[in-house]
Swiss-Prot record:
Post-translational modifications reported in the UniProt record: Palmitoylated. Probably palmitoylated by ZDHHC3 and ZDHHC7.
Membrane topology: Multi-pass membrane protein
Keywords linked to the UniProt accession: Calcium, Calcium channel, Calcium transport, Cell membrane, Ion channel, Ion transport, Lipoprotein, Membrane, Palmitate, Phosphoprotein, Postsynaptic cell membrane, Synapse, Transmembrane, Transmembrane helix, Transport, Voltage-gated channel
InterPro entries for the chain: CACNG_subunit, PMP22/EMP/MP20/Claudin, VDCC_g8su, VDCC_gsu
Gene3D superfamilies named among the record's database cross-references: 1.20.140.150
Modified residues (Phosphoserine): S251, S254
Pfam families, sorted: PMP22_Claudin (PF00822)
The name this protein goes by in its record: Voltage-dependent calcium channel gamma-8 subunit
Species name: Mus musculus
Location of the region described as Disordered in the Swiss-Prot/TrEMBL record: 271-304, 342-363, 378-423
GO process annotations (BP): regulation of AMPA receptor activity; regulation of postsynaptic membrane neurotransmitter receptor levels
Oligomeric and partner information: Interacts with CACNA1C. Identified in a complex with the L-type calcium channel subunits CACNA1C, CACNA2D1 and either CACNB1 or CACNB2. Acts as an auxiliary subunit for AMPA-selective glutamate receptors (AMPARs). Found in a complex with GRIA1, GRIA2, GRIA3, GRIA4, CNIH2, CNIH3, CACNG2, CACNG3, CACNG4, CACNG5 and CACNG7. Interacts with CNIH2. Found in a complex with GRIA1, GRIA2, GRIA3, GRIA4, DLG4 and CNIH2.
Length: 423
């Protein structure tokens, strides 16, 4: 709001909306009036024509001058002074003084090529389409400016008025150029120096030129009004956003400052996320050279899925043999990729071997860094493990010296019974 107030204070009185619209409206109807007067009057050009004199020479007489008895030559009569407009030519001197005649742009005794530039120029000059179009556009532009004072919310009306004023000025200047070209290109018996001294432009012509200048000025002014109204509407919407943000902040929201900083915050957050991702990609931790040990280069997350880990049954049998060598007691079982402690008990060798192999796989699996764990897929393939051999029965204990075993005692008892039985 402070910036809007400061901007309004810096503007002068001529920049006020009402003054600008009023000046544009007055200028539009003034330009339309000047162009209408220029089109309807017959004072565009002052020149001399033979239609107003009474001499024997006519406009089409190009023969040699008549000579008198004294041998002196007679000058050609330049004709009477006339003033002409877009439609008529009027005599100011001679017997036909005050008589106005319609201009004939296509004389019957002259043949014109319909494809020539002179013929097209005469058609445009005879129709006077560009001055008439300029007047119509000026009228429409003035109506649009007047309507913009009623419909102030519709800013496109004043923009359309500015475009109409600029187009009217261009149409006006094209019509003026065509008129000048048609007058300068008219054929005649006079040289260029003599023709320049025998015609001049009148006040109707200058009214048309003034209308062109005024149309361009009010066109620029109308576009300026549209720009100022658009800027004011933008500032008003910004102030409404501030008010809405202030109400949200008073009710527990983030306030207007957070709303205004939202695009820049998003930009900074995006920039920080990009820099952090770039830093993490540049400073990646080192990988191990071997699957089970640290200290070497690691695998890429995209290439780790190409490797498979297999279980070698021969290594598993070696681990089982080492585990069984413990004699059912406490021992150390060494697996293919990690060590597993030997379990107590003679009948648990197979289960201890399976646990040792799984512990070796877990040791390999945990050797990879945690950063690459999310993108790594490890597939373990290989033939199934051979079934564990049945445990050997325990050897019979040796009898103590001087004692007999149960089988020997039984045989001796049978022998004694057989000997002592009476026949």
């Amino acid at each position: 709001m402070e910036s809007l107030k400061r901007w309004n204070e810096e503007r002068g009185l001529w920049c006020e909306k009402g003054v600008q619209v009023l000046l544009t409206t007055i200028g539009a109807f003034s330009a339309f009036g000047l162009m209408t007067i220029a089109i309807s009057t017959d004072y565009w050009l002052y020149t001399r024509a033979l239609i107003c004199n009474t001499t024997n020479l006519t406009a089409g007489d190009d023969g040699p001058p008549h000579r008198g008895g004294s041998g002196s030559s007679e000058k050609k009569d330049p004709g009477g002074l006339t003033h002409s407009g877009l439609w008529r030519i009027c005599c100011l001197e001679g017997l036909k003084r005050g008589v106005c005649v319609k201009i004939n742009h296509f004389p019957e005794d002259t043949d014109y090529d319909h494809d020539s530039a002179e013929y097209l120029l005469r058609v445009v000059r005879a129709s006077s389409i560009f001055p008439i179009l300029s007047a119509i556009l000026l009228l429409l532009g003035g109506v649009c400016v007047a309507a913009s004072r009623v419909y102030k919310s519709k800013r496109n009306i004043i923009l359309g008025a500015g475009i109409l004023f600029v187009a009217a000025g261009l149409s006006n200047i094209i019509g003026v150029i065509v008129y000048i070209s048609a007058n300068a290109g008219e054929p005649g018996p006079k040289r260029d120096e003599e023709k320049k001294n025998h015609y001049s432009y009148g006040w109707s012509f200058y009214f048309g030129g003034l209308s062109f200048i005024l149309a361009e000025v009010i066109g620029v002014l109308a576009v300026n009004i549209y720009i100022e109204r658009s800027r004011e509407a933008h500032c008003q919407s910004r102030s409404d956003l501030l008010k809405a943000g202030g109400g949200a902040g008073g009710s527990g929201g983030s306030g207007p400052s957070a709303i205004l900083r939202l695009p820049s915050y998003r930009f900074r957050y995006r920039r920080r996320s990009r820099s952090s991702s770039r830093g993490s990609s540049e400073a990646s931790p080192s990988r191990d050279a071997s699957p089970g040990g640290p200290g070497g280069p690691g695998f890429a997350s995209t290439d780790i899925s190409m490797y498979t880990l297999s279980r070698d049954p021969s290594k598993g049998s070696v681990a089982a043999g080492l585990a069984s060598a413990g004699g059912g007691g406490s021992g150390a079982g060494v697996g293919a990729y990690g060590g597993a402690a030997g379990a107590a008990g003679g009948g648990g060798a197979g289960s201890e071997r399976d646990r040792g192999s799984s512990a070796g796989f877990l040791t390999l699996h945990n050797a990879f860094p945690k950063e690459a764990a999310s993108g790594v897929t490890v597939t373990v393939t290989g033939p199934p493990a051979a079934p564990a051999p049945a445990p050997a029965p325990p050897a019979p204990a040796a009898p103590a010296p001087g004692t007999l075993s149960k089988e020997a005692a039984a045989s001796n008892t049978n022998t004694l019974n057989r000997k002592t039985t009476p026949v």
